[in-house]
Amino acid sequence: MGVEVQRISPGDGKNFPKPGDTVSIHYTGTLADGSKFDSSRDRPGTFVTQIGVGRVIKGWDEGVLQLSVGEKAKLICTPDYAYGARGFPPVIPPNATLTFEVELLKIN
């Protein structure tokens, strides 16, 4: 259980976020059946959040810290690292494993 990081394309290999950093990310989230439930690319701008401090799901808090600036990866988050037994009705069902394709654009 946890988060699996599958690298798609490398980043700079030097600049990694630390807990508490604010990051700019593009992401697309999908359910196990491949259906998209959310994407920052469907909105203007990027998704900006503080990472590693509980502002986002645990899978992101741990997975994004492993990415360097410019890197693209899939974060596969088991339910305990996503929305758990409650899910996020009506978008995410209970006990859902979620996949996020994430691109770390910058550390702000």
UniProtKB/Swiss-Prot annotation:
Its main location: cytoplasm. Belongs to the FKBP-type PPIase family. FKBP1 subfamily. PPIases accelerate the folding of proteins. It catalyzes the cis-trans isomerization of proline imidic peptide bonds in oligopeptides. It comes from Emericella nidulans (strain FGSC A4 / ATCC 38163 / CBS 112.46 / NRRL 194 / M139). The keyword Isomerase applies. It is found in: Cytoplasm. GO terms for biological process: TOR signaling. Inhibited by both FK506 and rapamycin. Residues 1-20 are annotated as: Disordered. Keywords: Cytoplasm, Isomerase, Rotamase. This is FK506-binding protein 1A. Residues 20-108 form the PPIase FKBP-type domain. One of its GO terms (cellular component) is cytoplasm. Its EC number is 5.2.1.8. It is an enzyme of class 5 (isomerase). It catalyses: [protein]-peptidylproline (omega=180) = [protein]-peptidylproline (omega=0). Disulfide bonds: none annotated. The keyword Isomerase applies. GO terms for molecular function: peptidyl-prolyl cis-trans isomerase activity. PROSITE patterns: FKBP_PPIASE. The gene is fprA.
